[in-house]
């Protein structure tokens, strides 16, 4: 007859001992909830297109391209011409360029993808063309809202060595922009070697 009260006292003692642990656990859980909510909110925001993507998207359309190898003599006289179509992709998150040129009498086609990474706060680009099986990856920044973007990346020479590449994308107006490619020579100085002018078709 005395066992039940003794068991009851043990259960009560165990419950009292667990109260502080339960309180701490509850406080910890409540402290984590706002952080989790904040993380979810931030994740949702970074997945949506913002002003940077919107500005890139304004370049969508069809263009004529004039490609000049500015490091060569008579660059204007030897300029190559072609076309480019730029399209917004994946709900405004990226812009995809498909271009076709005739360079020194040979057809050359390329694909370029541009975007802005909301997490790293950097512009990103991937370039591919029929003159290579390699993909060129570039990251860039802008100090004027995307009107001028400075890209940097690496290319490869025929021996497989890495060569730094600097590219700028400069908006002239709503209907024209220029992409300039630069590299560093053996003397350590950077110089432009190619300039492509895009003019929107009317």
Regions found by a protein language model. Name each.
Residues 27-202:
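Hydrophobic small-molecule pocket/channel-lining residues, especially in calycin-type beta-barrels
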Residues 2-4, 25-30:
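N-terminal acidic, proline/glycine-rich, low-complexity intrinsically disordered segments
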Residues 2-13:
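Bacterial N-terminal signal peptides that target proteins for export
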Residues 2-3, 20, 173:
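Helix-centric, low-specificity signal for extended rod-like, repetitive segments
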Residues 13-22:
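Bacterial N-terminal signal peptides
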